[in-house]
Amino acid sequence: MSTHAPLAGRGALITGGGGGIGSASARLLVRDGASVTLMGRTEETLRKAVARLREDAAEGAELRYFVGDATDAESLSDALRCAAEPAGGLHMAVAVVGKGGEFTPLLMLDEQTFVERLRLNLVSAFLLIRQAAPPIAAAGGGSIVCISSDAARLAFPYLAGYTTAKAGLEALVRVAALELAPLQVRVNAVRPGLLRTELTEYLFEEPELLQQFLEQKPLGRLGSPEDVAAGVRFLAGPESGWMTGQSFGMEGGNELTRAPVLDGMARKRVGDAAFEAAMAGRPPEPADDS
């Protein structure tokens, strides 16, 4: 338990709070005294995360969880009210919810999957920014942090939905930062590379793919949720008080090189024949999106 609490008296909401980045970010916030509410869709996951995090919380820091859908505006509003109660206001919000991994050639990507990637990675962040800004402004100002991806800057093939959503997210961060600056609400983003979390565990069973990622990282290792959490903590707190509208990479230097070759994952996902047909401009008939 920490005795130094620079975030004491501040309330925070983290969407996707039960996952790797969400819970790692929460740990650093509560360690520095913030009262944090984790939002997610699975109560058991949230309950276990809160139980683990209590061991690291500074004196007076409160931990809560709220079961709800971050892509639903009404549910999100309820979660924000819950997060504001312990500290008497909301000062920080972190948008972690997202999903990637379609590994499908563009000519085979169905509309439903594409739109779903936008909903989870972009619309969820839009809703959090829109819903969190008024209570943060009412509390005297604060910070909103979004989780982007190095896919926003690098052209990752076969991930059209995910890369489009993350690029859009960073544009949203800039627009929101400009509009909300008079309210003293800062909006920034962290841009991680590949991390080992419960959502990406299946990728770590692909040694050739991991080698592709490692070869493009000058620092020579993959990241952890704790690496990204350090960036979230900086952007959420007063240490970054003169920063807004920024998206910065925490990806081992990957943006200095290029995206990995993902042909193998796409072939595994759709099959060799379909992959080759799509890349030759003759994709199989698309599935019914209805």
Please give the residue ranges for each predicted region.
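Short C-terminal tail/terminal secondary-structure segment
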Residues: 2, 103, 244-290
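Conserved glycine-rich cofactor-binding loop
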Residues: 11, 18-20
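Substrate-binding pocket helix/loop in short-chain dehydrogenase/reductase
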Residues: 104-106, 110-115, 213
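Active-site helix of classical SDR
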Residues: 129, 165, 173
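Alpha-helical segment proximal to the catalytic Tyr-Lys
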Residues: 134, 178-179, 241
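Residue(s) in the substrate-gating loop at a strand-loop-helix junction
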Residues: 149
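Short, small/polar-rich loop/turn modules that mediate ligand/substrate recognition or access, typified
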Residues: 181, 186, 243-245
